[in-house]
Amino acid sequence: TNIPQTMQDLDLQEVAGKWHSVAMAASDISLLDSEEAPLRVYIEKLRPTPEDNLEIILREGENKGCAEKKIFAEKTESPAEFKINYLDEDTVFALDSDYKNYLFLCMKNAATPGQSLVCQYLARTQMVDEEIMEKFRRALQPLPGRVQIVPDLTRMAERCRI
């Protein structure tokens, strides 16, 4: 399965801080198709650790409410890829970022990358930039399978979205 190239370099200090999930995409839309879907999570913050690992703070739907979770992402030899243990996903990687406005972040299971791939367009504000949205669409094209984008999350009143 052909997964697009991740960023060659990722400056953790530059991606640190608050983010908003403005668009999501998945190789299997059932991973995202409802508020309770397993990988429909809203990333709030990225926090680098002194060891160059990454703490991902997110919110997800749980029992008709919303729960905050932390995922510990362990650095790998690739500066833009991290090992995680979250549901069936074991890898998180950055596809692209300009650090100031957007970050495209994906999660996958290395054993079945074409079946459980989920990506997010994260923005520093809740505003969707159409140029960046188009860039997100293009970044997803080389992904395996038919990756579908969940419609504009910023217009949805979801309990876990901040």
From Swiss-Prot:
Disulfide bonds join 66-160, 106-119. GO terms for molecular function: retinol binding. It is found in: Secreted. Keywords: Disulfide bond, Milk protein, Retinol-binding, Secreted, Transport. It comes from the Eukaryota. GO terms for cellular component: extracellular region. InterPro entries: Blactoglobulin, Calycin, Lipocalin, Lipocalin_CS, Lipocln_cytosolic_FA-bd_dom. Pfam families: Lipocalin. Synthesized in mammary gland and secreted in milk. Its main location: secreted. Belongs to the calycin superfamily. Lipocalin family. Monomer. Primary component of whey, it binds retinol and is probably involved in the transport of that molecule. This is Beta-lactoglobulin-1. The lineage of its organism: Eukaryota, Metazoa, Chordata, Craniata, Vertebrata.
